[in-house]
Amino acid sequence: MKTIRTLTHVLLISSTFSLTAQPAMRGPLPDEQQEIIAEMAKRHQDLKRAVELNDKGYTATTTTTDKALAAKLKAHLKYMAARLDSKAMVRRWDPAFVELVEYYDQLDTKITELDDGVKVGVIGKNADAVKVAQNHARIVTGFTKEGAKAVEREHKPALTKDAAENGSKKEAEPAKPEAKK
């Protein structure tokens, strides 16, 4: 009986630690992530981004010569991938990101950490998912070009909502900024 009680305590303690070690995936971004985003937006000119669009999606490489900034970029990408994998919302006020979350299960994403940044390959499982992925690539490129200005505004989804409701999705002009409401 004592062995079972001890084993139960060990399991409870270990599961408690494993649960608390996971970042919160629901609700607002943790302060650490908000600080990373603010830092990357402020130092956007220190980030270099190259994107290759293809008929199945895209490949993007984002790098920096600053090791601390590269570490923040990697931490942010790792967190966002986990958040999207958990089906948690991202930027619920931004139509393009709402669309990304809706289509995320139709995207295959491969993340490769580099010494100076990250390389991300995204493949859409269908034509609409490809459009959504490429729109996201353009938006993130805008973040690296414009910094906070681009981060703070809404972005158009790749697929128009009215076309989606009618069952035939019509491509919208991707990644053009909208004024924040």
Residue map of PLM features:
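Primarily extracytoplasmic ectodomains and periplasmic/lumenal surface modules that are beta-strand-rich
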Residues: 57-58, 66-71, 79-81, 126-129
